[in-house]
Regions:
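Short glycine-rich His-centered loop
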Residues: 3-29
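Conserved SAM/AdoMet-binding glycine-rich loop
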Residues: 2-10, 198-205
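Radical SAM [4Fe-4S] cluster-binding motif and immediate context
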Residues: 150-205
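Flexible loop residues that form catalytic
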Residues: 12-15, 72, 119, 186
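N-terminal [4Fe-4S]-dependent radical SAM core
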Residues: 18, 128-171
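Glycine-rich beta-alpha loop elements in corrinoid/cobalamin-binding modules
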Residues: 34, 38-148
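Nucleotide donor/acceptor-binding cores
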Residues: 3-6, 65, 166
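Alpha-helix N-cap and loop-to-helix initiation/capping positions
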Residues: 26-30, 74, 114, 118, ...
Length: 205
């Protein structure tokens, strides 16, 4: 598929964001920087839409070439329902995130492709294969680095819907290794961005 792609990137709302016992305002503080970063791997002529269900309504009646869904533990069932709806109409669905990495066999039942681990290395490989009609069922991160990630696609972020639209990622993971926490396993330690990368991010804001 050498023509430009029509892509929809979705962050389904977390269950607790819809609960009357939690403060919904918490979930409109920051935009989905992870998805906006991965969007940087698409070509300039690709038509990419980023939708955060915490701050806007999700329409699943469209038919893009590709739907990318970020999945956490507490939005997994909502993400699966969205994926199943798109796939029932022939739309290709790729899913990644913490829950996908933790339960890949379960997730594979609801996606055409799953990405295990952070997506900065695996996601561009998937995009290249998808364009060439040979996407695999599963991609796993072969390394975990944040040194060469593309600029965040802030043009896709609906800034007026967030309290802190200019948030930056300057590190990933955690310097501690608590047995009960997922972060050490998922991110494989604590990584920080070089000063130059952080400065560029500030200047682009």
């Amino acid at each position: 598929m050498k023509r430009p792609l029509k892509v929809k990137m979705i962050l389904p709302s977390l269950d607790e964001a819809k609960s009357p016992y939690w403060r919904p305002i918490k979930y409109s503080l920051f935009p989905p920087i992870g998805l906006a970063t991965l969007a940087g791997y698409f070509r300039d002529d690709d038509e990419v839409v980023l939708l955060d269900q915490h701050v806007e309504k999700l329409d699943i009646t469209d038919t893009p070439d590709l739907v990318c869904i970020q999945v956490y533990v507490t939005n997994a069932y909502r993400a699966y329902a969205i994926a199943d709806s798109y796939r029932s109409r022939g739309v290709y669905v790729v899913m990644g995130g913490l829950h996908i990495t933790a339960l890949p066999e379960e997730a594979a039942l609801h996606a055409d492709t799953i990405i295990i681990g952070p997506g900065e290395e695996a996601f561009p490989r998937f995009i290249n294969d998808f364009r060439n009609g040979c996407a695999q069922k599963r991609y796993a991160a072969q390394w975990r680095s944040i040194e060469d990630i593309p600029p965040v696609r802030r043009d896709l972020i609906k800034r007026s819907k967030y309290f802190v639209p200019n948030s930056l990622v300057v590190s990933r993971g955690c310097p501690h290794q608590c047995d009960f926490c997922y972060k050490d396993a998922f991110y494989e330690g604590w990584k920080i961005l070089l000063y130059g990368s952080c400065r560029c991010g500030v200047e682009r804001n």
